[in-house]
């Protein structure tokens, strides 16, 4: 493809990255708020499922919270930076970080499935499979369809 002419699909991929990065930031803020209220959430008016979810989060521990927080920041930054790289068609910033995002996201989804209690999304469920779709699609598109569209 001629330099300066960005494929529409690559632009769409960048927009999706920005949307997912923003969504991740909102989730990160929710995670921080949840951590701030650990132990202060009244559960007497909740049903058993909600109580189990709150208790699972409260029993998660600080190290698990830090792990989730770090993964969220890393994923969000990779999405944002690779999205910018897609728009500028930069090899390292777009293609490179996009591939890193795909690999990190797949690995973190698998680790999360094993580490988290079922009450808070652990185990291989439909949400795990849905969470794997975008990173896999990203890897496939970057290494086939858009492989030649990145410069310097």
Residue spans for each PLM region:
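Topology signature of small-to-medium multi-pass alpha-helical membrane proteins
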Residues: 2-152
